[in-house]
Amino acid sequence: MKILKKIITKDYYKILISIKKIKIAWDIGNGAMGAVIKEITNNLNNSENILINEEVDGNFPNHHPDPTVPKNMEQLIKSVKDNKCDIGLAFDGDGDRLGVVDNLGNLVWADQYMLLLCTEIANLYDIQK
């Protein structure tokens, strides 16, 4: 197995900006990602971004920042539906876990979106499936 080590930030941004205009709801959960989310969303030129709970506050006044708990995703689900977003993304407190909501407000679990991501990566590098 070949291990690929590469900084992908610029390549990732190129992929993101090549996609059709997309509307994204982000629930930062008052966690650490609040410190960098503006930089990330400012680089997504083809997106409309709706940020909720973006102010860093370790007391987590809106909900516990654990996107694996459905109750913690209720604000994001409402934002996706109310704003007719294409996708909703939520982070945990330190930004190392991701919660995903589809355009209908359904939770997309990690094993489901990892399968999609792995398929896309395999296609990028022409990896045999």
Name each model feature, range by range.
Residues 47, 86, 128:
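Short acidic/polar active-site loop segments enriched in Thr and Asp
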Residues 80-102, 107:
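Glycine-rich phosphate-binding loop
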Residues 56, 64, 102-104, 112:
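Solvent-exposed, flexible loop/coil residues
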